[in-house]
From Swiss-Prot:
The RuvA-RuvB-RuvC complex processes Holliday junction (HJ) DNA during genetic recombination and DNA repair, while the RuvA-RuvB complex plays an important role in the rescue of blocked DNA replication forks via replication fork reversal (RFR). RuvA specifically binds to HJ cruciform DNA, conferring on it an open structure. The RuvB hexamer acts as an ATP-dependent pump, pulling dsDNA into and through the RuvAB complex. HJ branch migration allows RuvC to scan DNA until it finds its consensus sequence, where it cleaves and resolves the cruciform DNA. Residues 144-150 are annotated as: Flexible linker. Disulfide bonds: none annotated. Homotetramer. Forms an RuvA(8)-RuvB(12)-Holliday junction (HJ) complex. HJ DNA is sandwiched between 2 RuvA tetramers; dsDNA enters through RuvA and exits via RuvB. An RuvB hexamer assembles on each DNA strand where it exits the tetramer. Each RuvB hexamer is contacted by two RuvA subunits (via domain III) on 2 adjacent RuvB subunits; this complex drives branch migration. In the full resolvosome a probable DNA-RuvA(4)-RuvB(12)-RuvC(2) complex forms which resolves the HJ. This is Holliday junction branch migration complex subunit RuvA. It comes from Staphylococcus haemolyticus (strain JCSC1435).
Amino acid sequence: MYAYIRGKLTQLFPTHVVVESINGVGYEIQTPNSYRFQKYLEKELVIYTSLIVREDAQLLYGFINEEEKDMFLSLIKVTGIGPKSALAILATSTPNEVKMAIENENDAYLTKFPGIGKKTARQIVLDLKGKVQITRETTETLLSMNEENSNSENLVKEALLALEALGYSKREISKVEKVLNKSTFDSVDEAVKLGLKTLVS
């Protein structure tokens, strides 16, 4: 229904962003690692969207490019994979990394994500192998956010909230917190990326 939304990014939360369209409507959009959009705060952007209608809600999901959106739509067709699990996978990996894991039948890689057990990882491979095309990485896919003059301690707190929203356990987050507290960051996205890297390593 909504292929994409163009507007100003007005708010950023651990699980979602708010984009105000040209007609003044604010769209709440669920995203994988919302802090990747941090540099667009109060700026205009295009976010590629998919509307999912459930009995109790209509939810918009948003992505940095069409490739990421297509990967999300492929993942949620797999039995046992809901939107939250698909977002958690894409928060940590580029679409190409997921596709390579599928094509190489790398179940171990897929089970590193919250909510993905051995059975579900095998189902992803069975359902999607041969149906996903590995493409050349774009700069959009590898979007890097840099915000200057931010307080590292607050950035770590926000990063931990983002990881919790993705479904990681308190024990896993506690492990990440120790790593993040030893580092300094210029943006929440930078802290989230290190946290995700720690969790899947």
